[in-house]
C-alpha cells in the first residue's frame, strides 16, 4: 500500500474508488494499491 498526495491508475486493471471519504486505487497487482493521505 502506497500513501500518496495524488493517486493515479498505473495499469488498465487499476480501479479508483472512494472509501470513507478517501480516494484509493485497488488492483490485481498488490504493488499498485494506493491510498490518498
Curated annotation (Swiss-Prot):
Signal peptide: none annotated. The keyword Acetylation does not apply. The keyword Ribosomal protein applies. It comes from the Bacteria. GO terms for molecular function: structural constituent of ribosome. GO terms for biological process: translation. PROSITE patterns: RIBOSOMAL_L36. GO terms for cellular component: cytoplasm; ribonucleoprotein complex; ribosome. It holds the Pfam family Ribosomal_L36. Keywords: Ribonucleoprotein, Ribosomal protein. Belongs to the bacterial ribosomal protein bL36 family. This is Large ribosomal subunit protein bL36. It comes from Clostridioides difficile (strain 630) (Peptoclostridium difficile). The lineage of its organism: Bacteria, Bacillati, Bacillota, Clostridia, Peptostreptococcales.
Amino acid at each position: 500500500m502506497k500513501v500518496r498526495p495524488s493517486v493515479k491508475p498505473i495499469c488498465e486493471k487499476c480501479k479508483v474508488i472512494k472509501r470513507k471519504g478517501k480516494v484509493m486505487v485497488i488492483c490485481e497487482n498488490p504493488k499498485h494499491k494506493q491510498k490518498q493521505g
